[in-house]
């Protein structure tokens, strides 16, 4: 095996290890649940018309107040 091929195999192993550890860690720390909560908060903000009159909300979500 050449040096370039060995480097490519090394990168693939590192990438595979990173992907496996990242996805297994998400389940342990309830990453999906946190994403669902964040999505719920964003949709809750979409339903509130008073967000446009609140400066902090208006800055965080300018797409709502167009």
Curated annotation (Swiss-Prot):
Pfam families the record matches: Toxin_8
Q: Which residues form the propeptide?
A: 22-49
Q: Which domain of life is it from?
A: Eukaryota
Predominant location: secreted
How is expression of this protein distributed across tissues?
Expressed by the venom duct.
Q: Where are the transmembrane segments?
A: none
Q: Which PROSITE patterns match?
A: ALPHA_CONOTOXIN
Q: Does the keyword Disulfide bond apply?
A: yes
| Location in the cell | Secreted
One GO MF term attached to the UniProt entry: toxin activity
Task: Indicate the secretion signal residues.
Answer: 1-21
Q: What UniProt keywords are attached to this protein's entry?
A: Acetylcholine receptor inhibiting toxin, Disulfide bond, Ion channel impairing toxin, Neurotoxin, Postsynaptic neurotoxin, Secreted, Signal, Toxin
Ser-Xaa-Pro motif, crucial for potent interaction with nAChR: annotated segments: 53-55
Give the UniProt entry's GO cellular component terms.
extracellular region; host cell postsynaptic membrane
Q: Cystine bridges: which residues?
A: 51-57, 52-65
- What the record says about its domains? The cysteine framework is I (CC-C-C). Alpha4/7 pattern.
Role played: Alpha-conotoxins act on postsynaptic membranes, they bind to the nicotinic acetylcholine receptors (nAChR) and thus inhibit them.
Q: What family does the database annotate?
A: Belongs to the conotoxin A superfamily.
Q: What is this protein called?
A: Alpha-conotoxin-like Tx2
Organism in which the protein naturally occurs = Conus textile
């Amino acid at each position: 095996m050449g040096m370039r091929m060995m480097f490519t195999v090394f990168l693939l192993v590192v990438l595979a290890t990173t992907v496996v550890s990242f996805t297994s860690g998400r389940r342990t720390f309830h990453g999906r649940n946190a994403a669902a909560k964040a999505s719920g908060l964003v949709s809750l903000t979409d339903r509130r018309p008073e967000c446009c009159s609140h400066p902090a909300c208006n800055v965080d979500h300018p797409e709502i107040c167009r």
